[in-house]
Design a protein with these regions (language model features):
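Generic structural signal for coil/turn-prone sequence and helix-edge features
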Residues: 1-386, 433-507
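Cys/His-coordinated zinc-finger cores
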Residues: 388, 397-426
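Glycine-rich, flexible loop segments associated with nucleotide phosphate handling
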Residues: 253-258, 392-400
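Flanking scaffold residues of small Cys/His-coordinated metal-binding clusters
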Residues: 374-379, 393, 402, 422
Length: 507
């Protein structure tokens, strides 16, 4: 095993072979977590340098394949806690429990290597520490791999009679199929919620791209884990600042970890279209936007905590800022969040508004929204189907904004406090546009839109206000269209209609 070295000069051949043999069935390793952890440490200590990495990547693909197999082997969802997504206590303890032949001197030495790197000696190695080291080992191998063209490198190496570097093909990163492997890998984030874990998934995305993207964006936990891991890192930095001796973390290592998370954000921004990013963010919009706000406020403090700022660190800070903004501004835009700089970080709001203006003029969008409101001549309380025609009269407008009509006081009250499109959130902005511009008299004028835009610009009306108005009107129609479709579905299904009527009578 030419050139491969180990910590404490253990037999490198046996370290690799026993590690791989133990994971022949990664669902049931032959050894405990301490033994597996010790093997990894014996081959990957920092003092062993990059030479070991290169030798392992060229000569011992089976070593990396075993590491990947342990992280990606499908496990029953019942093995995991539904709240934390960590392994269930009994599963975790069974995994960590030592069944090794401790009479074997080599096994004793491997256990000693593991103990030497952990604060508490002589106890089982936690699954979280084994997971962390697995992610480190794989990430170190994928860092150069993500910048290489794996297919071209394999062809060139074969033609030159050289050994191919691991991974030789993207499929080696999802040995149990893309869906099953990625779902299993993501569950490890509940066991090892670390920046290196997200960084590794980012590297996999850089290499495998669309082959695994659907299962990354389709995860029901990954968006929240992204926000959680960012917050864990910030809290660790705060602890380091207050009690430096309490943690191994330094401002420099914190910056490196934040860069790893930013790389994952970078891959999402580069690879996801609007539909995919909306699927990813899904139920985590608030968490992701809060994450962005937190990081953008934290970065100047993190920068100050670095003793001397190198050119590389300056670049890293800008990279982190760029891709947290890029991800969060897209989430803000795609989910039609208000352009409110008191609620969201100003940089997120401004970049989101910039994306909107690339699609069209927010002022003209607002005018078109006003025109659509006027055309429909109906009550704008979601859930109400009354129109001017059905009621035989025009409806009174909201007295505050003098724009939105309602058929009755109860409808207006309900609309004011609606859970998704509350009129109270936009009324003041609507009123300011009506008061300062030629509305509503110019709505039917073919040149009314241009007159409206010119007036807004002349009076210095903020485009963000117009954008908020346009988006709110869009949301109103979306809400009302959803309700209309539901009612039409009920009317087309007699059984459901009867059930609905029966429920109404009971009430």
């Amino acid at each position: 095993m030419s050139g491969l070295r180990t910590h404490t000069n253990l037999d490198p051949s046996r370290v690799v072979n026993d590690f791989v043999a133990s994971l022949a069935d990664p669902r049931q390793p032959l050894h405990c977590t301490k033994f597996l952890h010790g093997c990894l440490m014996a081959l990957n200590r920092k003092e062993l340098g990059l030479a070991n990495l290169q030798i392992l990547r060229t000569q011992h693909h089976e070593f990396y394949n075993a590491c990947v197999a342990l992280l990606t082997v499908p496990r029953p969802r019942g093995d995991f806690n539904d709240e934390t997504w960590g392994l269930r206590k009994d599963i975790k303890e069974g995994f960590e429990k030592c069944r090794c032949d401790t009479k074997d001197t080599f096994v004793q030495q491997i256990h000693a290597v593991s103990d030497s790197t952990r604060r508490i000696k002589g106890v089982p190695c936690p699954c979280s520490e084994l997971g962390y080291l697995l992610f480190v080992v794989i990430n170190n191998a994928l860092q150069p791999a993500k910048d290489e063209n794996i297919h071209n490198n394999a062809v060139k190496a074969t033609q030159a009679g050289e050994q191919v570097l691991w991974p030789t093909k993207p499929h080696e990163l999802f040995p149990y199929g893309a869906k099953e492997s990625m779902e299993a890998l993501i569950l490890w984030l509940g066991i090892t919620p670390e920046a290196i874990s997200l960084g590794t998934i980012g590297c996999m995305l850089a290499i495998c791209k669309q082959q695994i993207l659907p299962y990354i964006v389709g995860s029901e936990i990954l968006a929240d884990k992204l926000a959680d891991i960012t917050e864990i890192l910030r809290m660790a930095w705060m602890t380091q600042q207050q009690v430096p001796e309490s943690t191994k973390l330094t401002p420099t290592s914190c910056l490196v970890d934040l860069g790893r998370i930013a790389f994952f954000c970078h891959m999402l921004v580069d690879l996801c279209n609007e539909t995919e990013l909306k699927q990813f963010a899904g139920r985590s919009v608030e968490n992701l936007l809060h994450m962005g706000d937190t990081v953008l406020k934290w970065l100047p403090e993190l920068q100050k905590s670095l003793q001397s700022l190198s050119a590389t660190e300056t670049h890293d800070i800008e990279y982190i800022r760029t891709y947290y903004i890029a991800l969060c501004s897209r989430v803000h835009r795609y989910f039609d969040e208000p352009f409110d700089s008191t609620k969201f970080h100003p940089l997120i709001v401004s970049h989101s508004l910039q994306r909107l203006t690339q699609q069209g003029d927010p002022l003209m969008m607002a005018f078109e929204g006003f025109r659509r409101l006027a055309d429909n001549q109906r009550c704008y309380a979601p859930g109400c189907s009354e129109t001017f025609s059905s009621a035989g009269r025009r409806f009174h407008k909201c007295a505050r904004c003098n724009l939105i009509p309602y058929c009755s006081k109860p409808c207006q009250t309900r609309a004011w406090k609606h859970p998704t499109v509350p009129h109270r959130s936009i009324c003041k902005k609507l009123g300011s546009l009506v008061e300062l511009t030629p509305l509503p008299s110019k709505l039917m004028d073919p040149m009314g839109g241009e007159a409206f835009v010119q007036t807004c610009k002349a009076k210095g009306i903020d485009e963000a206000i117009a954008a908020d108005v346009a988006i709110h009107i869009k949301k109103i129609f979306k809400e009302m269209d959803t309700i209309t479709c539901t009612l039409e579905f009920l009317l087309q299904n007699p059984i459901l209609t009867d059930m609905f009527r029966g429920a109404s009578k009971i009430q």
